[in-house]
């Protein structure tokens, strides 16, 4: 499919996060199903998910003799790690120990070593155990183990890695509130750690791609969080500089975000979105970004209508956006209606209905609801099925303010790209 972003997003996802995307693509005609099955096998063959690998091997008509030996080794290693970490869990499950632990990890580690005989190496075994469980597809167990490890460890690199691991575990077990908490920790880690600019750019790209999971599985709350993150100075700069295809998801988050179109938060996000889409049109385009450009930059209703028809196909073939397709299309039609009414003083309901791919009766209900919801100064003339609109004039002073806002935003983006990236 022309606008499929799978090959753009895969390099920025962990193999376990890629698995649900491959499952989604099966049977959709975008890729050959046998090739997808082989890709799934190749993707997971280095993990500890041996039972599932045996099933995939059979489906592919292969007989991987090494899998049985690998399975036995996984079971053996799991038992060894359980035994090796038992003393750590026994200490952590002691209420007396919990009451003695403080916020200072260095002090805690000294206490655990001197009073309870736990070494740094034993604590680090929790990380290894959590990682092993994760690679076996036991995400809830891995999440719990990594939580305990992170609470005790003073190793910044391992703590950062454990945070990424917990983030993935919570995504894969659909613990969306916890996912957003982990995302906050990751942002703090990426923004505060002493990384060189190139490393920081790459880390932010991973945060952006991983965050698509909770943002589009968490209804309005998720889309709000996406807008807050992606429109922040450092992240919008990253998107524009390194992964402009993410604009597709920003378009959906803004337009299908659930806010009334008259709300100030929606209007601000929409203005910022239009500005960024216009800036990046030579770097990235798809039907969703072109819909925004057609409607708000070119004011071409015919082109916007054509792009909206293509948007539906793109949305329903995108793992992250399929569930938001109906909400996006509904909201996009409302936006088309509002802009159409804004540039006309008299609107023919039949013509507007045709533009929106609605019947005459649907169009009449649509425009009546639009006038009510958007508080337009308008009235319907039933004698000739038209809508008469009264547009208040915008002062030159207000127009200058709006232009200045746009220049200020762009200047800040240019400065941020120069400093941050």
Swiss-Prot record:
Q: What is this protein called?
A: Eukaryotic translation initiation factor 3 subunit E
- Please state every residue range assigned to the domain named PCI: 215-394
Q: How does it assemble?
A: Component of the eukaryotic translation initiation factor 3 (eIF-3) complex.
Job description of the protein: Component of the eukaryotic translation initiation factor 3 (eIF-3) complex, which is involved in protein synthesis of a specialized repertoire of mRNAs and, together with other initiation factors, stimulates binding of mRNA and methionyl-tRNAi to the 40S ribosome. The eIF-3 complex specifically targets and initiates translation of a subset of mRNAs involved in cell proliferation.
Keyword annotations: Cytoplasm, Initiation factor, Protein biosynthesis
Q: Which GO terms describe its cellular component?
A: cytosol; eukaryotic 43S preinitiation complex; eukaryotic 48S preinitiation complex; eukaryotic translation initiation factor 3 complex; eukaryotic translation initiation factor 3 complex, eIF3e; nucleus; proteasome regulatory particle, lid subcomplex
Q: Which gene encodes it?
A: INT6
Main localization of the protein? cytoplasm
- SUPFAM superfamilies per record: Winged helix' DNA-binding domain
């Amino acid at each position: 499919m022309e606008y499929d972003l799978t090959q753009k997003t895969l390099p920025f996802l962990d193999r376990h996060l890629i698995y649900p995307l491959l499952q989604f693509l099966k049977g959709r005609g975008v890729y050959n199903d046998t090739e997808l099955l082989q890709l799934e096998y190749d993707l997971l063959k280095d993990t500890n998910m041996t039972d599932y690998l045996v099933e995939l091997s059979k489906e592919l008509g292969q007989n991987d003799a090494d899998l049985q030996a690998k399975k036995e080794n996984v079971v053996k290693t799991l038992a060894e790690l359980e035994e090796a970490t038992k003393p750590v869990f026994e200490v952590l499950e002691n209420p007396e120990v919990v009451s003695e632990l403080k916020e200072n990890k260095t002090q805690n580690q000294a206490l655990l070593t001197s009073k309870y005989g736990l070494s740094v190496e034993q604590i680090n075994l929790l990380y290894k155990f959590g990682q092993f469980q994760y690679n076996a597809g036991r995400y809830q167990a891995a999440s719990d183990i990594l939580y305990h490890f992170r609470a005790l460890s003073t190793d910044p690199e391992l703590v950062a890695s454990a945070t990424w691991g917990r983030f993935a575990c919570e995504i894969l077990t659909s613990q969306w509130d916890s996912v957003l908490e982990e995302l906050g920790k990751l942002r703090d880690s990426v923004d505060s750690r002493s990384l060189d600019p190139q490393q920081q750019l790459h880390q932010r790209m991973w945060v952006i791609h991983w965050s698509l999971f909770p943002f589009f599985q968490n209804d309005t709350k998720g889309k709000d969080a996406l807008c807050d993150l992606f429109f922040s100075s450092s992240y919008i700069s990253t998107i524009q500089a390194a992964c402009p295809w993410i604009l597709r998801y920003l378009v959906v988050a803004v337009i299908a975000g659930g806010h009334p179109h008259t709300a100030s938060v929606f209007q601000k996000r929409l203005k910022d979105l239009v500005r960024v889409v216009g800036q990046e049109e030579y770097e990235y385009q798809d039907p969703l970004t072109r819909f925004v450009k057609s409607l708000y930059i070119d004011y071409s209703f015919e082109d916007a209508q054509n792009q909206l028809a293509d948007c539906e196909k793109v949305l329903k073939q995108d793992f992250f956006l399929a569930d938001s397709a109906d909400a996006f299309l509904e909201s996009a039609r409302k936006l088309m209606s509002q802009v159409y009414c804004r540039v006309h003083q008299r609107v023919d309901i039949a013509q507007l209905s045709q533009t929106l791919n609605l019947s005459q009766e649907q169009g009449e209900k649509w425009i009546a609801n639009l006038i009510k919801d958007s508080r337009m100064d308008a009235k319907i003339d039933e004698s000739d099925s038209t809508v008469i609109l009264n547009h208040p004039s915008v002062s030159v002073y207000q127009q200058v303010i709006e232009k200045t806002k746009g220049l200020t935003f762009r200047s800040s983006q240019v400065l941020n790209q120069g400093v941050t990236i």
